[in-house]
Amino acid sequence: LKTDSAERKVPVYCLLKTDEYQLFHNHVVEQRLLNQENLYLFRNWNENSKLNKHTVTTPFRMIMNELFKTHDYSFHSFRHTAANHLSVLLNCDYAPLIKNLTDYTEEQYQSIRTELLRHTHGQNHWFMIAHLLGHIDPTETFKSYIHLSYLIAGHKILQSHPDIDTK
């Protein structure tokens, strides 16, 4: 954790696919069965200390370097991807955007929306994403993470003005 306020609850049960959730759940159960006070979900072997950032980033970079001749991918890229997937998922209809930009099925899309949102429309969508990223409000989230806002805005405009030619 960067700061004490960085600790938050993330509803992984609805965000992960069934097989992903099962692996995650098994890891959590395994950690609890060790009967040790674990302050960190992922920690150094036989220690109760947080992982050094290079424990994950170095192997990730090596794998990406093997897969791609040139790239700009970093482990932090997953954070951007998650923020953008959630922004589209919470603010757009399933077809065509969610169907074409993510690997979520329509059933998973509905389940995530039902679990995360109390209302079907509103600013709470952006505050939800900001909270999951550890931001107090959506300002930093939009400034640094939401790269698909124009796409989402275009989708919303088309919804409110169906007479606009989409070609």
Each language-model region and where it sits:
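Catalytic-site neighborhood detector that most strongly recognizes the C-terminal catalytic loop/helix
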Residues: 47-49, 109-126, 132-166
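DNA breakage-rejoining catalytic core of tyrosine-based enzymes
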Residues: 2-14
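Extended charged low-complexity segments that act as oligomerization/scaffolding linkers
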Residues: 1-3, 20, 40-45, 63, ...
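Active-site/catalytic core of tyrosine-dependent DNA strand-transfer enzymes
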Residues: 11-72, 77-92
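Structured alpha-helical bundle/scaffold domains in large eukaryotic membrane-trafficking regulators
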Residues: 24-27, 98, 145
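A generic secondary-structure boundary signal that marks alpha-helix termini
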Residues: 21, 69, 91-95, 138, ...
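Active-site-proximal segment of tyrosine recombinases
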Residues: 73, 83-86, 90-134
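Extended hydrophobic-aromatic, low-complexity segments
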Residues: 3, 72-76, 95-98, 141-142, ...
